[in-house]
UniProtKB/Swiss-Prot annotation:
Organism lineage: Eukaryota, Metazoa, Chordata, Craniata, Vertebrata
Biological role stated in the UniProt entry: Serine protease inhibitor.
Origin superkingdom: Eukaryota
SUPFAM superfamilies for this protein: BPTI-like
Protein name: Kunitz-type serine protease inhibitor G1
Organism: Micrurus pyrrhocryptus (Coral snake)
Gene3D superfamilies attached to this UniProt entry: Pancreatic trypsin inhibitor Kunitz domain
Length: 35
């Protein structure tokens, strides 16, 4: 089962903070980290 946070799109938003987040990559079938 894929965690809910992995289903979110990779949106860094307007914040200038440097916080790691995750999104689901259907090509690799894994959660990918982005900042």
């Amino acid at each position: 089962k894929v965690p809910a946070y992995c289903k979110l799109p990779p949106d860094s938003g307007p914040c200038k903070g440097h916080f790691p987040a995750f999104y689901y990559d259907p090509v690799s079938s894994y959660c990918q980290k982005f900042i």
